[in-house]
Amino acid sequence: MHLEFSEQDLQFRNEVRAWIAEAFDPELRAMMAQSKNGYLDKAGQVRWQKALHARGWAAPNWPEAYGGPGWTPTQRHIFQSELAAAGCPPVSPMGLKMVAPVIMKYGTAAQKARFLPPILKSDVWWCQGYSEPNSGSDLASLQLRADLATDGDGAHYVLNGSKIWTTHAQWADWMFCLVRTSRDARRQEGISFVLLDMRTPGITVVALPTLDGPVPGQQEVNQVFFDNVRVPVENRIGEEGMGWTYAKYLLEFERGGTYGPTLSKQLAKVAAIAADQPGDDGRRLLEDAGFRRKLAQLHLRAAGLQAVELKLFSGVESGKSIGAASSMLKLLGTEAMQAISELAVEAAGPAALPFVQDTWAEIQGREASPRVGPDYAAVLAPRYFNYRKASIYGGSNEIQRNIIAKLMLGL
């Protein structure tokens, strides 16, 4: 395992830093400062991702054959670390990080030619159709029906049912979706993986309110209803009934990632808040030994996680697969995210309590009262509530513990 960067790696890091300093302009920085979930609205995301694409850096994990930069795992880690350290928005993962690898591995030549170029350019927005009202962690129980039919338009599936917790479905042009094409086989064997145009007749998207409040431009989750929605058979990825295999492959990309640098950036913000807040005795909160101990413990968790990430990426560079370790990264990373958001609210104290007041006032038809406290505190409560879901999406952390126990510990 090599934890020290080579001279070439350090030169690459400087190149990335110089580009970020120019491309991540004050307007984007201000938008990110008020983001409750770490992403921009659609217009902001598209603008950022097209800037990355213009530099050739929109898809660091893609092979060169499909338009990727051809980086080593270490370069990819450096790139993601520098973006996180600068507070840049991550790319929306649904297209570039999730469905694209599935299309590359299991799609036909025609599907690759049709879907991959617009994904790379961020010309087409994707959402994920996995969870259902009665199928979350037990995803194999999904029931969205896809009945095969043939008429003058050729062979197609007719979809009836719904998906839920569908992130940014209101923005999406396309959805990658798990559907049930058979009820006779084992649950996992009756699932297929299809791509569907969100403009198809019969699709209805309904926004779901969440605890973090109605922040303009930051609506996240939706329920999507399908009423006799026709999906051409040629939009199925791979073989019928093999969707579960493709979904498991995709989840490796959803669960894995670079958490350490992002957590360190969040902790630096917490320290800045604490340095600005007086404690009960009039001293700055950062001077309080108890608070500093909590902050130090989280710094150690972030540093430990980053060391694990570097070890895993070093293995990837030697030809090893991350495999079930992606569950470990997801578990440790999301729990640390939640703990940091809790400490940020604690640091800001009463200033963190009012949130999205202007929006609530507008909904209620009244004038907004002045917000108490510094500007940075306005987003702390929405972010705290938003991060409660981090231990659930992508497979709940309870499921991740089961995977770790079975595949890594042999229990």
Q: Where do the protein language model's features map onto the residues?
A:
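A short core secondary-structure module
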Residues: 143, 155-206
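Alpha-helix capping/hinge segments and adjacent helical runs
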Residues: 22, 57, 69, 327-411
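Glycine-rich phosphate/pyrophosphate-binding beta-alpha loops
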Residues: 135-136, 164-169, 389-396
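Internal helix-loop-helix
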Residues: 46-123, 168-174, 302, 316-324, ...
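Loop-to-helix element that buttresses phosphate recognition and phosphoryl-transfer chemistry
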Residues: 272, 293-318, 334-347
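Glycine-rich beta->alpha junctions and the first turn(s) of the following alpha-helix
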Residues: 3-5, 204-305, 390, 406
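A short, Trp-centered hydrophobic/proline-enriched beta-strand micro-motif
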Residues: 122-130
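A structural signal for short hydrophobic beta-strand segments in well-ordered beta-sheet cores
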Residues: 144-148
